[in-house]
Every structure is written in structure tokens, then in C-alpha cells.
Amino acid sequence: MAVKTYQAGVKEYRQTYWMPEYTPLDTDLLACFKITPQAGVDREEAAAAVAAESSTGTWTTVWTDLLTDMDYYKGRAYRIEDVPGDDTCFYAFIAYPIDLFEEGSVVNVFTSLVGNVFGFKAIRALRLEDIRFPIAYVKTCNGPPNGIQVERDVINKYGRPLLGCTIKPKLGLSGKNYGRAVYECLRGGLDFTKDDENINSQPFMRWKQRFDFVQEATLKAEQETGERKGHYLNVTAPTPDEMFKRAEYAKEIGAPIIMHDYITGGFCANTGLAQWCRDNGMLLHIHRAMHAVLDRNPHHGIHFRVLTKILRLSGGDHLHTGTVVGKLEGDRASTLGWIDLLRESYVPEDRSRGIFFDQDWGSMPGAFAVASGGIHVWHMPALVTIFGDDSVLQFGGGTLGHPWGNAAGAAANRVALEACVQARNEGRQVEKEGREILTAAAQHSPELKIAMETWKEIKFEFDTVDKLDVTNK
């Protein structure tokens, strides 16, 4: 290596970090950023600044650069692309050597890629659109504690989506009344019930009281139906120690599945909890509370496809992914993209779905996609079509809002699901023929008939805020 000499001062980032001739290595971690630069900052300099500030650079040259191989460790901005329909911003593709990141630590990856660089003054707005994790890094992460196949074997249910329900009202019920609602929903035909994300341990219902009543309800429903049932017990807590205390108690009373809010709870806590679940044979349901703070602004933040990849690496057997048809944000093409990233072993680049890189997961198991938020029986044909079998369809208000009560709401959803799955297996176009399929099933199910009458006019037809850039062409 040639002798280097130190020259103090400030130089343009592009002199060191803009490398359009660079060909990424298979072991590089690749990132795509959407950059909106400040006025007067050209694209190459802005891209190089992001590469520098998210890897080895600082605002001035430092003599300690001579003590390491900066040419190896630096991030490299190697490509720039236009954003379709928006000339205020551009895509910058940056390659990072794998040795910049601690093995198995999504915390460390995010600290670099979405750390101080997001407050950099030369950048008006910055969004992390996608990451390609090299297989060499994927193999250092434990991933889902169980995965899709193991969970199906545990609950002994195959060939259809699973049915769930979030207990409502989400806050205010006593432990006994909460357990009663769980029992009625599970007895009526659901596979799972669920704590809402903001149920932890409040004055109206402490966590241990809830766990006890819920497990009693679950066991009673199992005995009466002959099916394996479960309730997602939310162990999210103020401290990691308290979180693990609640998880241990859930295991002690025989609960098959626990739940964590992975963004508000933290990626470090989630990775640790996933490892605990793997060691203790527990299923882990993941809620994405706070995601929209990060991913809904189309110019600044972190796209949900990145948060999906991070969760798969950190660990979780279920992840909320939106519904397309319900009350929450998420267009169809994007949602199908991150569902594949959650479940498939290999996902190729597909700009029509917002996927910027090939992603190889190797042998890492996938996780169930969870559809939840403003859905009811009329949505069932679309949900079965969009999400397929390896999903959990969760109807909260669409179960507990039934005029005849919780058990009737659960029965209506179970009949609707089985009718749609049967029609699909017969080769019918379920989404197109949905009304006919549900109407025929309702002739033999008064619970479904009443549900269809109750929610026939309920739609959530709002435009998506975060559109795929490809749709702007």
C-alpha cells in the first residue's frame, strides 16, 4: 500500500465517497435512499454525503484516517436514479462493506443507516427505501423463533389462513370481562384472540390478572371445540427485565404464544425476546405500533419494506402488514411486496412492487403476514386472494361488533373464510365472485347473514398517501 500523508482541511464528500465505477460485492450491504437535497447541493455531493455520514466520514479530514484502511471501510455511493414523477428528489444507491456492522445486530445496522445522517443539514429530506442484506449477514441473524411450518404443526391447522380477533374495547375492561370476550370469540370459531398493542399492565387490568383469565378462557374453548387455540399475551413492558418476567409467566401457565410491540419496545428487546421464544418453544406475535411515524411520509423516514426485513432478521412469527382493503394505509402492490419479503426464501428485484434489490433469505424461515384493521366479512374474498394461506386474518370490530354477540361474530367469520377457501380450491375467482360465494354460504349461517347485512355499506375508500413511485410515471 502506498504511503499516505495527512492533509488537514475540508473537502467535498464526492472526492472520497462518490464512486460510479464501483461494482458492489456479494458481501456488501446495499441501501437505496430517496434524497431531497437542499438548494445548491448537487446530486453527487448529496449522495456522497449520505454515504460518508452513514459510514466512516465526518465533516473534516482527520489524521486517524491514516491508521486504518479507509478505502475498504467507507460506504460508496455508486448509482443515482431519477424518482418517477418527482424532480425534487432522487434515488441514491450506496454499498457498505459487511464488516461495518456487528453480526446479528439490526440495532447496529439502523444506528448507522438511519442515525445522525437523517439530521444532516445539507439534506432537506431523506428516506431509506430498501436494503439488500447479503446472505453472509442474514446467516448471522436468528430470524423468526419458529416460522410458518413449525407454527402450523404446533396448532395443527393447515390449508387455510388463520383467524384472529383483537379484543375490544382495547382499553378499560376488567380481567374477568376480558377473559369472557376471549372465550366467546375462541368458542365461536376463531383460532386466536389478541391483546391490543397498548394493553400492557394498567390500573384497570394488571398483566397477571389478564394472563390468568385469558388462559382459563383459552383452555375452556379448546376443551369445548377440540381445536388448539391461543391468545397473544402482550409482554411489552417498561423494562427488558419486566418483559422477560411476563414472558416466563406466560410459559408457566401454558400459553402457546406471546406478543411484542417491536418498534416501541425496541429492536434490542425484540431480538432478545425472539431468542427467548426460540429457546422456550413459544410463538411470537409482532405488532408494528409506531410504524406510520417512520414510514408514511413518502420523502422522509424508513419504508415499511425495510421495517419488514428488519423484523424478519430480529425475529417474530407474525407481523402486522396492513390489509389493502381495511382502514389502514397500504396499497396493493406495495403490500404484496413486503408480504413476500416476510414469507419467501428468495425475492427478486421488482420495481413494480417497490422492491429495489434481490433478497436471499437462505434457509431462514418466514413469518405469517397479519391482516388487521377495519376488516369485516365482506372483505374476506379479497383478503383470501391477497394474503393466501400463510396469513392471519384478524377481525376485531368485525367480530365483537356483531349484533348477536362475540361468538356469533366469530362464527360468521369462520363460515365466510371456509366458504372462500373452498371456492378457491374449486378453481373459482374468489375476489371477483365474492358476493355470490358469501351469499350462498349465508343461506346456511344466520350469523354470517346478519354480519353481511350489518356491514354491507362500510368501506374505507381513501387515497394512499405513500404511493409507489412507479405509479407516478
Curated annotation (Swiss-Prot):
Its cofactor is Mg(2+). Belongs to the RuBisCO large chain family. Type I subfamily. RuBisCO catalyzes two reactions: the carboxylation of D-ribulose 1,5-bisphosphate, the primary event in carbon dioxide fixation, as well as the oxidative fragmentation of the pentose substrate. Both reactions occur simultaneously and in competition at the same active site. Mg(2+) binds at residues 194, 196-197. Heterohexadecamer of 8 large chains and 8 small chains. The record marks 327 as: Transition state stabilizer. It is an enzyme of class 4 (lyase). One of its GO terms (biological process) is reductive pentose-phosphate cycle. PANTHER family: RIBULOSE BISPHOSPHATE CARBOXYLASE (PTHR42704), RIBULOSE BISPHOSPHATE CARBOXYLASE LARGE CHAIN (PTHR42704:SF17). Pfam families: RuBisCO_large, RuBisCO_large_N. NCBIfam families: PRK04208.1. The active site is at residues 168, 287. The keyword Magnesium applies. The keyword Metal-binding applies. The modification N6-carboxylysine is found at residue 194. The basic functional RuBisCO is composed of a large chain homodimer in a 'head-to-tail' conformation. In form I RuBisCO this homodimer is arranged in a barrel-like tetramer with the small subunits forming a tetrameric 'cap' on each end of the 'barrel'. Substrate binds at residues 116, 166, 170, 288, 320, 372. This is Ribulose bisphosphate carboxylase large chain.
